[in-house]
Design a protein with these regions (language model features):
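A conserved beta-strand element that flanks and buttresses the S-adenosyl-L-methionine
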Residues: 110
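Short catalytic micro-motifs in class I SAM-dependent methyltransferases
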Residues: 113-117
Length: 203
């Protein structure tokens, strides 16, 4: 997919800068506590779009008993994550391409600010791929924007963003039979109330 490849190249080129400006590993601390209470105590969890390991401190602290696996489409991000957390498992993976995903069944998933980079016409494939690698009835976490979330001037940002309304997001989750357990509005770096986070349960 052209859009995903363009986004990958962006992160491979600008990943170091992105990592150094996205430093709040605990921005999602409150929902993470909820997730840990829903996931099996020693469950295997996949972090989809792990970047340079920005959310790993949550897993090493609050979720320290969980078995962590991080995937990302960017080689640079995987290199950074592996350097920072050599005791954990990271690998290249594209959530829209099942052939690149781990051949495991996970007890839950974490997908913060990543599903938006896949064009909407490929969401059915992407969501099916998530279902294939996670156990039935497992819980997951996703964040999606309702407006463009980037602090970069939009015409200078070549990454793909799928922007749909909150109602459209919820309708899509319902169409997939993903049960909505929690929904909260979050501020972005440069825009208020831009993010919706969802804790979901798969069918």
């Amino acid at each position: 997919m052209k859009e995903i490849e363009t986004t990958r190249k962006y992160y491979d080129k600008h990943g170091d800068h992105w990592i150094n400006t996205k430093t709040n590993s605990f921005a999602h601390e409150k929902p993470f506590h909820k997730l840990v209470s829903l996931w099996p105590e020693k469950g295997r969890i996949i972090d989809i779009g792990c970047a340079g390991g920005i959310h790993v401190p949550l897993f090493l602290g609050i979720g320290r008993k969980l078995k962590y696996q991080g995937i990302d489409i960017s080689k640079l991000f995987i290199k950074i994550a592996t350097r920072r957390y050599p005791q954990l498992s990271f690998s290249l993976g594209n959530v829209a391409d099942s052939t690149t995903l781990p051949k495991l069944k996970f007890d839950g998933f974490y997908a913060s600010a990543i599903l938006m980079h896949v064009p909407f016409e490929h969401w059915d494939t992407m969501f099916s791929n998530i279902e294939k690698i996670t156990k039935p009835g497992s819980y997951g976490y996703i964040t999606l924007p309702i407006t463009h979330p980037s602090a970069v001037k939009q015409d200078a940002d070549v990454r793909h963003f799928t922007i749909i309304t909150e109602a459209e997001q919820i309708d899509y989750l319902k169409k997939r039979n993903w049960k909505l357990k929690q929904k909260v509005t979050l501020d972005g770096t440069s825009t208020a109330n831009v993010w919706r986070y969802y804790i979901v349960q798969l069918p």
